[in-house]
């Protein structure tokens, strides 16, 4: 595989000399493409769980709180383990943990395919969560190492693989799993093996990179942000991640039920509508990172979270046609925030790439999982439409973006 410049394994400074070495041609796009493709594969398998919720609800007689518990098990497991794995890998990099994570997701998928009761469904969801916890921090680190200094672009390309994977899941469920039944989930084992093979090669590149990195002199970033401002900024970024992911969880877990209940569409049509939302989110992810490289992460966060407010407020009152349009706009706008959030957090805490990625990916999974469970309880107590009215106010938390520092290239935290 193509080899990346020495970026991201340790804190570095963006001096003019370094900037001169980090032109686009030095960005290891082959490596970034590989981890992005595997992110797609990983998240296709993950999204199949949520995509077959209507089928599982029908076949197992589940309540909404049980649907929410499946999401909480998957995302809660991932959220608890990711920061710990990221912190450990900052000290002891684990290049070959990537195919292991994919293997755990594969096993979880097989358990889901042949589960005969609800407890086995929960076990399958937990194994998928463990796979995500192993995959995301190290894969995010590899994308940064291969970025050639274009951190926002690399983070977007990495994350968009996951977004496209999440978008493909409902379509695959609609046209393969729903017509053929739960056992057909096992067919996707083929792409899991492909992913494991690719990640083994990525792990080999990563190991060679780490071997060279130990021989280089370490550089440090210039201290320009006070520590108390770092704490405030990280708390704000966590709150913004919470607001974004709770709203996104309301869509990914319950959108199909919402459109079926309100507009009387079929399960397959509801899956296609979910694909429209998730596909738009993938497009937003592509835009967020490169735009952040040009205009700054803070500006992207302003637009992506607070800018979604008019559309989320309008969604509960929209017709079927406008629901499709509004959900697409919401997905496009809100999804552009996360690459910028991760990059800004990594700039604030230099030298802790894996830990920061683990915390924010873990926070994203955890808040979404807890939200899915709680929103399921609300949906049982009230109705699905009430859930979307309640969640429509969450993007107003984007006003907290005003508290974030204005970092320029070459600046970092203490």
Which residues does each predicted region cover?
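Residue-level signature of mid-helix packing/kink "hotspots" within the transmembrane helices
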Residues: 47, 75-83, 166-167, 278-286, ...
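Extracytoplasmic gate region of multi-pass secondary transporters
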Residues: 49-50, 232-283
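Helix-breaking motifs and short loop linkers at transmembrane-helix boundaries and internal kinks
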Residues: 61, 93, 114-119, 148, ...
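Conserved MFS/SLC helix-loop-helix module at the cytosolic interface between two early adjacent transmembrane helices
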Residues: 80-119
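Helix-to-loop junctions at the C-terminal end of transmembrane segments
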Residues: 81-93, 284-296, 379-380
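Cytoplasmic helix-loop-helix junction between adjacent transmembrane helices
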Residues: 124-161
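Helix-loop-helix hairpin linking two adjacent transmembrane segments in secondary transporters
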Residues: 158-207
């Amino acid at each position: 595989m193509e080899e990346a410049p020495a970026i991201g394994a340790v804190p570095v400074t963006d001096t003019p000399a370094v900037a001169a070495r980090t032109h686009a041609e030095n960005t290891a796009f082959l490596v970034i493409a590989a981890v992005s493709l595997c992110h797609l594969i990983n998240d296709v398998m993950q999204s199949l769980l949520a995509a077959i919720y209507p089928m599982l609800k029908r076949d197992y007689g589940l309540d909404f709180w049980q649907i929410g518990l499946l999401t909480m098990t998957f995302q809660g497991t991932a959220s608890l383990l990711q920061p710990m794995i990221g912190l450990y890998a900052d000290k002891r990099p684990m290049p070959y943990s990537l195919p292991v994570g994919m293997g755990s997701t594969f096993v979880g998928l097989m358990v889901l395919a042949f589960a005969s009761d609800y407890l086995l469904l929960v076990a399958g969801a937990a194994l998928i969560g463990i796979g995500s916890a192993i995959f995301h921090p190290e894969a995010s680190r590899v994308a940064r190492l291969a970025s050639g200094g274009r951190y926002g672009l690399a983070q977007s390309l990495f994350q968009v693989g996951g977004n496209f994977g999440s978008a493909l899941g409902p379509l695959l469920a609609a046209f393969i799993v729903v017509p053929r039944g739960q056992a057909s989930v096992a067919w996707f084992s083929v792409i899991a093996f492909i992913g494991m093979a690719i990640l083994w090669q990525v792990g080999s590149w990563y190991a060679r990179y780490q071997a060279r990195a130990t021989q280089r002199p370490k550089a440090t970033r210039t201290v320009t942000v006070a520590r108390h401002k770092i704490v405030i900024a990280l708390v704000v970024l966590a709150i913004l991640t919470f607001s974004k992911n709770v709203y996104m969880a309301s869509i990914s877990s319950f959108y199909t039920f919402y459109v079926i209940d309100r507009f009387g569409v079929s399960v397959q049509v509801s899956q296609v509508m979910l694909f429209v939302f998730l596909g738009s989110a993938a497009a937003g992810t592509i835009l967020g990172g490169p735009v952040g490289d040009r205009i700054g992460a803070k500006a992207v966060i302003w637009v992506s979270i607070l800018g979604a407010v008019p559309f989320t407020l309008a969604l509960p009152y929209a017709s079927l046609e406008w629901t499709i349009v509004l959900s697409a706009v919401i997905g496009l706008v809100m999804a552009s925030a996360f690459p910028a959030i991760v990059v800004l957090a990594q700039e604030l805490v230099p030298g802790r790439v894996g830990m920061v990625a683990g915390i924010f990916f873990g926070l994203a999974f955890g808040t979404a999982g807890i939200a899915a469970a709680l929103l399921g309880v609300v949906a049982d107590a009230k109705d699905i439409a009430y859930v979307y009215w309640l969640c429509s106010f969450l993007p107003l938390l984007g006003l907290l973006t005003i508290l974030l520092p204005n970092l320029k290239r070459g600046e970092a935290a203490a």
